[in-house]
Amino acid sequence: MADEQRILDIIDGLEENFTEQEAYRIYIEFCFRFIPRIEHKIPEKLRAHLEAAEGYWHAGNVSPQALENARVLIWKYLDSHNLTYAPLRKSAAIRFMHQLFWDKANTDIWDHFDWCRELLPHLGYKNHTVRQELEYVLSEATREGFAA
């Protein structure tokens, strides 16, 4: 329960201390922390799109339009494989990856983290790991200044 409360406190802090886009950037970096661990659960056809997300968020050499195009292709994959409304356990890795393909927050930061926290248990991650990764990314964001 302490991990759960710490997660909620961190999210509250993001909302209070960062702009919406800065908090979203922290969220994106948080999501990137899990990709190497779940990549094997993502169909190979979709893994190639991770380069677009990496290029957009880290290298700055991918356009918002290219990011959107990849996002649409991922959604079409979900739809064509009847995973759009399937139980999360069947599509959690793809849906988690899909979070990286929005170039800006499309809802408030709580909604993003709620969705993420709904997906992570289906991928085998408990609150303890979520808290650790969230603390790490927040520390890095503050230290490196990418979100401050």
What are these regions (language model features)?
Residues M1-A148:
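Structured binding/interaction patches within domain cores
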